[in-house]
């Protein structure tokens, strides 16, 4: 059976609650989306297609009256997500959840502010999906060129960190919003320590991992628990990806810590400026 298209908010669509408000001047249209060039899995390719559709939907909504913004955005964006639903059913619940979180989080004193808030929230929710697919799609490091330069133990720990992240993210996904941090932290610590045994503290990249976790936690300033966790997961995803890249070129552990922490800060900082980012799509 064909996969269901992700829900678009309560019956009648989000436009219903906004169209009753006074009109407002259209925002500046977003720049036309361009496909990014480094997708490596089918899901990543679909995410990039959705990114192009997302940018196009924002641009289309920017050029219509207030009463038509949500309807226009929804029509344009649904066509992109429908293609993803048909080709990768596993993306459906993720897109559905992203849209639901964005719809519930939309606030603003004016119709324009409400719509911008919705797009900003959806931007960050989609960023988490894209970031998770990126880190989960990193090739086993042993398949990358130049891996002979890195000690086998250091190569293995990268895979173990990535595996622990997946386990923890999966556990947190089913936990109540208020418990996501606790569940993630407990599952991540348990998985990484079990997989490395007594050698946990001997790996050079452990300091960078700890720095990344601290940066990611420190960056979660959003009020809503589900948004806090989404920002944290995106930040840690980027940090682990950065650590993997640093290890691949065999840089010192101090360099890995700097890159990983910087990636976490950058990812979280994107949330505070989400309204600006939204105009250009959610791809990093």
Swiss-Prot record:
InterPro entries the record matches: Poa_pIX/Phl_pVI (IPR002914), Pollen_allergen/Os (IPR035506)
Molecular functions per Gene Ontology: RNA nuclease activity
Keyword NAD: no
Superkingdom of this protein's organism: Eukaryota
Leader sequence residues: 1-19
Residue ranges, annotated region (Disordered): 1-21
Keywords attached to this entry: Allergen, Disulfide bond, Signal
Pfam families on file: Pollen_allerg_2
Record carries keyword Disulfide bond: yes
UniProt function note: Has ribonuclease activity. May be involved in host-pathogen interactions.
SUBUNIT field: Homodimer; disulfide-linked.
Family, per entry: Belongs to the Poa p IX/Phl p VI allergen family.
Protein name according to UniProt: Pollen allergen Phl p 5b
Lineage start: Eukaryota, Viridiplantae, Streptophyta, Embryophyta, Tracheophyta
């Amino acid at each position: 059976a064909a996969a269901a298209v992700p829900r678009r908010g309560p019956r009648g669509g989000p436009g219903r609650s906004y169209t009753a408000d006074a009109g407002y001047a259209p925002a500046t249209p977003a720049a036309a989306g361009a496909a990014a060039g480094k997708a490596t899995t089918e899901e990543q390719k679909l995410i990039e297609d959705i990114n192009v559709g997302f940018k196009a939907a924002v641009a289309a909504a920017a050029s219509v009256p207030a009463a038509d913004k949500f309807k226009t955005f929804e029509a344009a964006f649904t066509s992109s997500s429908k293609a993803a639903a048909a080709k990768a059913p596993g993306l459906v619940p993720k897109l559905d959840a992203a849209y639901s979180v964005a719809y519930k989080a939309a606030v603003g004193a004016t119709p324009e502010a409400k719509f911008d808030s919705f797009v900003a929230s959806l931007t960050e929710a989609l960023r988490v999906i894209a970031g998770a697919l990126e880190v989960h799609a990193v090739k086993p490091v042993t398949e990358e060129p130049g891996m002979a330069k890195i000690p086998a133990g250091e190569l293995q720990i990268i895979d173990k960190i990535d595996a622990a992240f997946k386990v923890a993210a999966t556990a947190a996904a089913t936990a109540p919003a208020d418990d996501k941090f606790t569940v993630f932290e407990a599952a991540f610590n348990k998985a990484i320590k079990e997989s490395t045994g007594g050698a946990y503290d001997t790996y050079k990249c452990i300091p960078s991992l700890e720095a990344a976790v601290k940066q990611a936690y420190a960056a979660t300033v959003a009020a809503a628990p589900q948004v806090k966790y989404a920002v944290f997961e995106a930040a840690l995803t980027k940090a682990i990806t950065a650590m993997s890249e640093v290890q691949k070129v065999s840089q010192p552990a101090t360099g890995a810590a700097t890159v990983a922490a910087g990636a976490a800060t950058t990812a979280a900082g994107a949330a505070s400026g989400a309204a600006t980012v939204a105009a250009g799509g959610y791809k990093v």
